Structure formats: C-alpha cells, structure tokens
Amino acid sequence: MADSSFDIVSKVDRQEVDNALNQAAKELATRFDFRGTDTTIAWKGDEAIELTSSTGERVKAAVDVFKEKLIRRDISMKAFDAGEPQASGKTYKVNGTLKQGISSESAKKITKLIRDEGPKGVKTQIQGDEIRVSSKKRDDLQAVIAMLKQADLDVALQFVNYR
C-alpha cells in the first residue's frame, strides 16, 4: 500500500483579501462616523495594505472594520499583521502586511510538534515554505490535521493535496 500524504501551507487568497479591502473601503466611505476624516484604505505593493485617517482613533477603527471584513471572508487574523498608528503630517497611517508562507522557524516548530505529539509512523519533510506530511494510514494523517487545528501556532495553516 502506498503512503498517503498532505501538504501544510500558509497562503492567503489575494482575491478574497481584495474583496475584503473593497468592502471595507465602501463602508469607510459611507459610515457616518468616518465622514470628514479622509479615511482611506489601499494596497501598497503586493503584500502590504495602508490605512490613513485624520485621527489616530479613526485609523484604529478603520483597521477594526478591515479585520471584520477579513473574518467574514474566512481569512485568519494570523495572516494579517497591522502595525501601530504613525503620525505623518496631519494624518495617521497604519501599514499592515499579509503573511504568506511558513518560515523555517515555524516549520521546525510544527514538525517537532508532529514528531512529539502525533501518531507514530508519521513522517514530515520541510519543502521550502511548506511541509509535506506522509504516513501509511490515512487515519494518522487526519489525527495530525486535528492536532494542528487545536494547536496554538502563530501562522494560519491550510491543508492541501490530501492524497
């Protein structure tokens, strides 16, 4: 019998983030408490999002609106990292970044967790920014997925290529 396997990745669907950003921009433009504050939200490069407003509290509220839209689109908050408001002239800015991929440090932590607490006979292999998990039994792989979903890790995980 051949080994079964799956890959652990940390990727964010950019289209879903774009939809959340557009919904947040629409809400910021129409909400009464944001009128007259020049609050904007926009992409800044491929992985960064910039929020600007005239006051520090309004820019924090704009971050909360954006996070709410991300949650509604099933995007984990672990995948979005918002900085602190920074004053620049008459406006306040928050730069947020999307976290893509599993860092080598996080990958080592995940493989150690699988080795220590997972079922015996499960093999892990780090392949760049993803982890391949293989075993002879599919039940063992499902147990690993359940264990990782329960674990408190600092990255958003998705499980793909389950074979």
Swiss-Prot record:
Keyword Magnesium attributed: no
Keyword Nucleotide-binding: yes
A Pfam family that the UniProt record links to this protein: DUF520
CC annotations in GO: cytosol
Domain of life: Bacteria
CDD domains for this protein: YajQ_like
Disulfide bonds: none
An annotated Gene Ontology molecular function: nucleotide binding
InterPro entries: DUF520, UPF0234-like_C, UPF0234_N, YajQ-like_sf
Entry keywords, A to Z: Nucleotide-binding
Functional description taken from the UniProt entry: Nucleotide-binding protein.
Stated family: Belongs to the YajQ family.
The protein's name in its UniProt record: Nucleotide-binding protein MAP_4063c
Organism: Mycolicibacterium paratuberculosis (strain ATCC BAA-968 / K-10)
